[in-house]
From Swiss-Prot:
Gene name for this UniProt entry: rplE
Molecular function terms from GO: rRNA binding; structural constituent of ribosome; tRNA binding
Subunit-structure text: Part of the 50S ribosomal subunit; part of the 5S rRNA/L5/L18/L25 subcomplex. Contacts the 5S rRNA and the P site tRNA. Forms a bridge to the 30S subunit in the 70S ribosome.
Name the record gives this protein: Large ribosomal subunit protein uL5
Source organism superkingdom: Bacteria
PANTHER family: 60S RIBOSOMAL PROTEIN L11-RELATED
PROSITE patterns assigned to the protein according to its UniProt record, in alphabetical order: RIBOSOMAL_L5 (PS00358)
Amino acid sequence: MAKLHDKYQETVVAELAKKFGYSSVMQVPRIEKITLNMGVGEAVADKKVMEHALRDMTAIAGQKPIVTVARKSVAGFKIREGYPIGCKVTLRGERMWEFLERLVDIAIPRIRDFRGLSAKAFDGRGNYAMGVREQIIFPEIDYDKIDKIRGMDIVITTSAKTDEEGHALLTAFNFPFKK
């Protein structure tokens, strides 16, 4: 089991139950899934770009990503319906906890000019979304083997009902929010 999952079960559940006055441990918010999304618009012109993006995403997530395709043709973007324009991975269970651990302990501290995560990125229902400008903050990516620096979106979906509960949950996992 991942360290963060053990920490969640041993200390975080009790802390949050006490703080928010839950009568049952099943009411305590938990992380349900983490979704990684990488938009690769350049893949329209060059198919190799998508292969590199898939390789990077596989290394970061530890599981094979799904290729996302354009739903509509847009002449301004030079894309047609069905063109591959990105990739995404949904992490649950053990892989999710391991990724969260790597994100908090290794990747976030490696972000250049980092001053803390914005506490305003909650969606109103306790889920948190953040963007990463460079995939090289993850230790699984070999700097010499990447063709281009790409960013990605990371969405942490929780069972929290409010942003306050979601913030308390992620703060308990040592997420470095701005004060």
